[in-house]
Amino acid sequence: AAGYKNITVLDISAEALEKAKKRLGPKAAQVHWIVCDITTFETDTLYDVWHDRAAFHFLTAPAQIQNYIATAKKAVSGFLAIGTFSKKGPFKCSGLEIIQYNETELKTLMEDGFNALNCTTENHTTPFNTQQNFLFCSFKRL
């Protein structure tokens, strides 16, 4: 919440949100917290920036992916940033199935509503000191 206003944080896990609130301390009161599955999230709010740090790769059913994209197209007025496992990343995460993406696949999924700006891959070191390769892509709403 460093200088930004009107921040919303959404996660399927109430426990994860509680941990984030504790890390922010008193600044947590400045954030709108939502416990929800992103594939069922409905809002009339427009967001200047939507940052998905690692949810998209957990959407494994075509309907989930399409619901996510439809929600983003409705809710994003500015920029969308997605971090997802690359083709060099793990096949599962936290025991759950995931989908790996390459730059072309992610851009193709988003092309109906977003212009791709930049994509990059990077290794992320987990708390267990293992490496996971991520693909990060940024988009601008058409």
Give the positions of each predicted feature:
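Class I (Rossmann-like) S-adenosyl-L-methionine-dependent methyltransferase catalytic domain
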Residues: 1-45, 59-142
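A conserved beta-strand element that flanks and buttresses the S-adenosyl-L-methionine
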Residues: 51
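Short catalytic micro-motifs in class I SAM-dependent methyltransferases
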Residues: 54-58
